[in-house]
């Protein structure tokens, strides 16, 4: 194969440098210092009629935030109001330094999220449908871009936009009785909340096409077999087996360095979208952001003194 021209190689290297710089520019110590406190209005005590319950767990679970979808009468379908509440919650959480892990679950037994609210959509003019789907995509993208680990606890039905919501999370766990699928082709449309892009990245292109083309619905065991979820649990009497597993995972994350967790997520996410050489450069740049942190020094000191580290996210 003919060698590339020097100018082309230079342009490629320049492009990689710019990409790495763009990925890591916001990771300096000053960025962590700017983290703000949670916005008012989100606490562990939320009115039961609210469609989204935001709970900041306390004591040994401090740092874990649970977003509980609570729209039983609509099977947790994504309505305009629920999207507005999700957007507001995510906007508040993304800049909160105290947040370490976010769990998305359902407060409604047997349902995670049934997708877009088709009853609401049926009342829309055709000119409203596009912007509504764009809003779903935007909110799901915001969830995917949260800087801390996110876990979807799927204890029930997750169809269409509901599965797309779960696909935006870093880790997915489900009960064996849960049902998951991108079923939009049954309605003569396609997944519009990122499903055509995130499902192939999760399970491979060929299988993703098969599932989307057929609108097939998988149970928890089948989803685990194809790599759609990380863990499958037998459902318990309370109907929250997946949530309990998600909580166990979140507790495993809590002792780790907060800055390191955020930077690791960024390095993985950005690196997966580029070639290996560029990905390694992103890793190097991200690693460099941890060197000057107080947490790194605390980790070394704790190791020397044979005690658990006390990380502050600095």
Curated annotation (Swiss-Prot):
GO terms for cellular component: mitochondrion. Its main location: mitochondrion. It is found in: Mitochondrion. Residues 80-94 are annotated as: RNA-binding. GO terms for biological process: L-leucine catabolic process. CDD domains: crotonase-like (cd06558). The modification N6-acetyllysine is found at residues 75, 88, 119, 179, 186. It catalyses: (3S)-3-hydroxy-3-methylglutaryl-CoA = 3-methyl-(2E)-glutaconyl-CoA + H2O; (3S)-citramalyl-CoA = itaconyl-CoA + H2O; 3-hydroxyisovaleryl-CoA = 3-methylbut-2-enoyl-CoA + H2O; (S)-3-hydroxyglutaryl-CoA = (2E)-glutaconyl-CoA + H2O. Detected in heart, brain, liver, spleen, skeletal muscle and kidney. Expressed in brain, kidney, liver and spleen tissue (at protein level). Signal peptide: none annotated. The modification N6-succinyllysine is found at residues 75, 84, 88, 119, 123, 135, 179, 186, 304. Its EC number is 4.2.1.18, 4.2.1.56. Pfam families: ECH_1. Residues 1-42 form a transit peptide. Pathway: Amino-acid degradation; L-leucine degradation; (S)-3-hydroxy-3-methylglutaryl-CoA from 3-isovaleryl-CoA: step 3/3. PROSITE patterns: ENOYL_COA_HYDRATASE (PS00166). InterPro entries: ClpP/crotonase-like_dom_sf (IPR029045), Enoyl-CoA_hyd/isom_CS (IPR018376), Enoyl-CoA_hydra/iso (IPR001753), Enoyl-CoA_hydra_C (IPR014748). Keywords: Acetylation, Branched-chain amino acid catabolism, Lyase, Mitochondrion, RNA-binding, Transit peptide. Belongs to the enoyl-CoA hydratase/isomerase family. Homohexamer. Catalyzes the fifth step in the leucine degradation pathway, the reversible hydration of 3-methylglutaconyl-CoA (3-MG-CoA) to 3-hydroxy-3-methylglutaryl-CoA (HMG-CoA). Can catalyze the reverse reaction but at a much lower rate in vitro. HMG-CoA is then quickly degraded by another enzyme (such as HMG-CoA lyase) to give acetyl-CoA and acetoacetate. This is Methylglutaconyl-CoA hydratase, mitochondrial. It comes from Mus musculus (Mouse). The gene is Auh.
């Amino acid at each position: 194969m003919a060698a590339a021209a020097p100018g082309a190689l230079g342009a490629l290297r320049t492009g990689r440098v710019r990409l790495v710089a763009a990925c890591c520019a916001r990771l300096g110590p000053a960025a962590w210092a700017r983290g703000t406190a949670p916005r008012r209005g989100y606490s562990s005590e939320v009115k039961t009629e609210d469609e989204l319950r935001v709970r900041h767990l306390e004591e040994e679970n401090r740092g874990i935030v649970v977003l509980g979808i609570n729209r039983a009468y609509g099977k947790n379908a994504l309505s305009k109001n629920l999207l507005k509440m999700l957007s507001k919650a995510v906007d508040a959480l993304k800049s909160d330094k105290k947040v370490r892990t976010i769990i998305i679950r359902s407060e409604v037994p047997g349902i995670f999220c049934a997708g877009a609210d088709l009853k609401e959509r049926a009342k829309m003019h055709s000119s409203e449908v596009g912007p509504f789907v764009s809003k779903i995509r935007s909110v799901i993208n915001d969830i995917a871009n949260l800087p801390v680990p996110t876990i979807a606890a799927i204890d029930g039905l997750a169809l269409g936009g509901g599965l797309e919501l779960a696909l935006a999370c870093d880790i997915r766990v489900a009960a064996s009785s849960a049902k998951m699928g991108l079923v939009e082709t049954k309605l003569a449309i396609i997944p519009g909340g990122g499903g055509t892009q995130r499902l192939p990245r999760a399970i491979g292109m060929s299988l993703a096409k098969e599932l989307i083309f057929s609108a097939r619905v998988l149970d928890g065991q089948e989803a685990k077999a194809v790599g759609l979820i990380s863990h499958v649990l037998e459902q318990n009497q309370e109907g929250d087996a997946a949530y309990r597993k998600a909580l166990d995972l979140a507790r495993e994350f809590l002792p780790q360095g907060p800055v390191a967790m955020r930077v690791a997520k960024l390095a993985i996410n950005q690196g997966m979208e580029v070639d290996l050489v560029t990905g390694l450069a992103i890793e190097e740049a991200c690693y460099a952001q941890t060197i000057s942190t107080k947490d790194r020094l605390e980790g070394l000191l704790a190791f020397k003194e044979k005690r658990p580290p006390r990380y502050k996210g600095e």
